[in-house]
Amino acid sequence: MSSIDYVQGTDSLKVSCRMEFEDFLKDLQTIDDDRNLRRSFNQQPFPSDLINQYFNSKVFIYINGKLLIGKLLSADLDGNDINLNLIYRLNKKPKSITVRNLILTGWYTDQTNLMIIRIDNFEKGIKLNPEHNEETYTIK
């Protein structure tokens, strides 16, 4: 489950993602199978460069047609889940948003990625999967 929230007055989006930690490690291996990932994630703080690389290769957010790059704010374990919070800087107020989510789509054919997008008065819940992994919306 992920959420994308426009933060008023800061020209940024805050993106939160919660997923099972074991699935996260498995999916992370698709971009970095050279490291002992379990050892890397047994230590705090988590390796932010690796999480940034992972998230930016799996979740693509375009505002007004421009691809944004996320930067990790925090990563926390909560039981069997990992919570990731990232920030995306904008240069203009959003008029359109395109989201592509590829998290776990290479592993599970029935994977569904739920996302909530909140920008000003616009709020939309979406389901993305391996065959339908992208949505575009105009913000009014």
Q: Where are the language model's segments positioned?
A:
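N-terminal soluble domains immediately following signal/targeting peptides that reside
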Residues: 1-140
